[in-house]
Amino acid sequence: CACFLESAVHETHACNYLLADDIDMEPVPGYAAASWKRGYGDFVFKPDLSTMRLVPWLEGTALVLCDVQDHHHQDLPHSPRGILKRQIARLTERGYKGMFASELEFYLFDQSYESIRAQHYREPRTANYHIEDYGILQTIRDEPVLRAIRKHLQAAGIAVENSKGEWGPGQEEINVRYADALTMADSHSIIKHACKEIALLQGKAITFMAKWNYNLAGSSSHIHNSLWSLKGNKPLFFDAKAEFGMSKLMRQWVAGQLKYAGDITYFLAPYINSYKRFQAGTFAPTRAVWSNDNRTAGFRLCGEGGKGIRIECRIGGADLNPYLAFA
């Protein structure tokens, strides 16, 4: 619109409590960056115009993602997108380009958000009645919502590869083509909002909680990651002469993730509910080990012996922040 082009295309401002609140948008005390003592002033939203796109599921609507800056136009040190950008810069200095893909699982409910809230979130009705994993008949029941999600995301410039039923009643997964770390994190964020908004428009509801029901499969966000040349044309994890096709660099990369698995889990499982997902016999990992094509390990080798070789971190739940998780 004209107002955006006149001013907001350069920047706009918002209350700085937005990076110091809880999941219910309540301000949380104890932060140096934003508090009642400091008066909850503004920070700057600087649009990243490379992320601008139409929002096909909403008439006359466009979307642009922003970097969060202070009044001197310096990135805030605690901005998740800024944290990832700094990590990417460090990786670039070493001559590497990180490529990522995140699988997103969620539960679809055959109720609206309002009706679920009215029943105090107790026993919401899932869109299906038994395990959907790779099932054809079951996922047809969910297709009106899933088709809309795939179609609209594709129209919004996100390269959807597929959706599929998962290991719970009404549980689905959406997969998109891998990309550089920042593009993938941006896409991940847009996908989650799109899924919830499209479901709302159809009178349905979606949750990305890691474990909304103790007796059902949790929802994960598996992160596929690999290193490439800066031009993105040479996979640096592949060595045709090495065991499994794993280059020395890849082995070092995996070793680092294993060594710090406990520390990075803070960003992969950020909430109390996140840890309820870690149950044996549910396809959620319970050991910080790596293995070749083994879905019970925290880190799974995929694409053995080929240029698509990568490591899949299976620790993360669907509730993770993609910017912090990728960083």
Regions found by a protein language model. Name each.
Residues 1-162, 325:
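ATP/Mg2+-dependent ligation/transfer catalytic cores
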Residues 64-70, 172-179, 225, 313:
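Short, hydrophobic beta-strand segments
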Residues 69-75, 138, 178-184, 231-232, ...:
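A generic structural motif
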Residues 99-107, 119-136, 156-176, 206-226, ...:
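Core alpha/beta catalytic barrel or barrel-like domain that forms the active/cofactor pocket
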Residues 117-126, 221-231, 288-290, 297-303:
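Short beta-strand elements
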Residues 121-146, 181-192, 196, 230-240:
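Acidic, His- and aromatic-enriched active-site or binding-groove loops in soluble protein domains
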Residues 137-142, 146-160, 174-181, 192-208:
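Accessory "access/gating" subregions that flank catalytic or transport cores
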Residues 183, 194-206, 237-327:
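C-terminal accessory/tail domains of diverse enzymes
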